[in-house]
Amino acid sequence: IGMVVECKDGYLVGNDGCKYSCSTRPGHYCASECSRVKGKDGYCYAWLACYCYNMPNWAPIWNSATNRCRGRK
């Protein structure tokens, strides 16, 4: 029996709509944060923000079209 599981990749965002910053965090920070929302793996992209792989569809990711970080669009 086959099962289709939808996953997505992207920048992890917090409740404020902002990307998770990683510039001053330890190397494993992003991988830990991504796995916390059931992502497969993650890394600190250009030492600025956490990028996650294979996250479930319910996990919030940053989108430039709907960016609401600190009330901005």
Curated annotation (Swiss-Prot):
**One GO cellular component term:** extracellular region
> Which PROSITE patterns does this chain map to?
LCN_CSAB
Keyword Amino-acid biosynthesis (UniProt): no
Q: Which one GO biological process term can you cite for this protein? A: defense response
Q: Which residues form the LCN-type CS-alpha/beta domain?
A: 8-70
Leader sequence range is 1-7
Q: Which UniProt keywords apply?
A: Amidation, Disulfide bond, Ion channel impairing toxin, Neurotoxin, Secreted, Signal, Toxin, Voltage-gated sodium channel impairing toxin
InterPro entries linked to this entry = LCN-type_CS_alpha_beta_dom, Scorpion_toxin-like, Scorpion_toxin-like_sf, Scorpion_toxinL, Scorpion_toxinL/defensin
Arginine amide carried by residues = R70
Where located? Secreted
List the GO molecular function terms: sodium channel inhibitor activity; toxin activity
Where expressed (tissues)? Expressed by the venom gland.
Q: Would I find Nucleotide-binding among this entry's keywords?
A: no
Top-rank taxon: Eukaryota
Entry similarity comment: Belongs to the long (4 C-C) scorpion toxin superfamily. Sodium channel inhibitor family. Beta subfamily.
In the record's own words, the domains note is: Has the structural arrangement of an alpha-helix connected to antiparallel beta-sheets by disulfide bonds (CS-alpha/beta).
Quote the function comment for this protein. Beta toxins bind voltage-independently at site-4 of sodium channels (Nav) and shift the voltage of activation toward more negative potentials thereby affecting sodium channel activation and promoting spontaneous and repetitive firing.
What is the protein's given name?
Answer: Toxin Td5
Tell me the organism.
Answer: Tityus discrepans (Venezuelan scorpion)
Lineage summary: Eukaryota, Metazoa, Ecdysozoa, Arthropoda, Chelicerata
